[in-house]
């Protein structure tokens, strides 16, 4: 049996995507819509307080295309907190006009290739990646993915050293986009339908296409990668929520 890779796990992660029932939303009076937006922003302010205390992080984006209208990405220390956030959101008036479109549950993950005598949880660089402050980049791209397990193309039957070598080559491509694309990898084996979630942040949306296209030629993606649905969107600052929902 091939050796399993040891992983480092950080904050739990929820991607919550909703579509807006615009027809129903329009039936409310201007005052009713205003109250619903204010209630929602009060919830968001609680998230901001958590982020300021460095006990979690979140991001809010509008989604381009018809797959969804809004994407929320929430990071918290426990799965229970993610559930509480989702429940609190669902109890708001605005949620009555939000239709669930997609969700993904995972945990921020890094592969541990450090020497056995080094405690990764004492390494500031690793801690910053396991418990990240999500950037306020202009754009987001999220997609789930698996490693293929078919015939000779079975990632999990490869020796550990061969997997390490290929992942190192794969990661070199990503490092070429340092400063252009910020990446958060989250593991989801046993949590959701795919094995990983990949979230990319960039101020230039075209960098998503360039990075993902270049990686497709690397063996890790070309031979072993299987991908789910892609979601891309634009940042939705708190101060623009009211305008976005205005009728």
UniProtKB/Swiss-Prot annotation:
InterPro entries, sorted: CHDC, ChdC/CLD, Dimeric_a/b-barrel
The free-text cofactor remark is: Fe-coproporphyrin III acts both as a substrate and a redox cofactor.
Q: Does the keyword Metal-binding apply?
A: yes
Which keywords belong to this entry?
Heme, Heme biosynthesis, Iron, Metal-binding, Oxidoreductase
Task: Cite the EC number.
Answer: 1.3.98.5
Q: Name one Pfam family in it.
A: Chlor_dismutase
Briefly state the protein's biological role. Answer: Involved in coproporphyrin-dependent heme b biosynthesis. Catalyzes the decarboxylation of Fe-coproporphyrin III (coproheme) to heme b (protoheme IX), the last step of the pathway. The reaction occurs in a stepwise manner with a three-propionate intermediate.
Annotated protein name in UniProt = Coproheme decarboxylase
Origin organism of this chain? Bacillus mycoides (strain KBAB4) (Bacillus weihenstephanensis)
Q: List the lineage, top down.
A: Bacteria, Bacillati, Bacillota, Bacilli, Bacillales
């Amino acid at each position: 049996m091939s050796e399993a890779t040891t992983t480092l796990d950080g904050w739990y992660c929820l991607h919550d995507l909703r579509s807006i029932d615009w027809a129903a939303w329009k039936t409310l009076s201007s005052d009713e819509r205003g109250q619903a937006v204010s209630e929602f922003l009060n919830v968001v302010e609680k998230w901001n307080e958590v982020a300021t205390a460095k006990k979690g992080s979140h991001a809010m984006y509008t989604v381009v295309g018809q797959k969804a209208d809004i994407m929320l990405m929430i990071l918290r220390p426990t799965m229970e907190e993610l559930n509480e956030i989702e429940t609190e959101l669902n109890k708001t008036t605005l949620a009555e006009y939000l239709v669930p479109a997609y969700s993904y549950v995972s945990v921020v993950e890094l592969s541990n290739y450090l020497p056995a005598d080094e405690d990764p949880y004492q390494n500031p660089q690793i801690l910053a990646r396991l418990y990240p402050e999500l950037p306020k980049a202009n754009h987001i791209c999220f997609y789930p993915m698996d490693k293929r397990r078919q015939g000779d193309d079975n990632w999990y039957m490869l020796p550990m050293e061969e997997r390490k070598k290929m992942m190192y080559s794969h990661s070199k491509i990503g490092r070429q986009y340092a400063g252009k694309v910020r990446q958060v990898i989250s593991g989801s084996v046993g949590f959701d339908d795919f094995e990983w979630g990949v979230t990319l942040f960039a101020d230039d949306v075209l960098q998503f296409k360039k990075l993902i296209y270049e990686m497709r030629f690397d063996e890790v993606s070309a031979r072993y990668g299987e991908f789910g649905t892609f979601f891309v969107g634009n940042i939705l600052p708190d101060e623009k929520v009211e305008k976005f929902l205005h009728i």
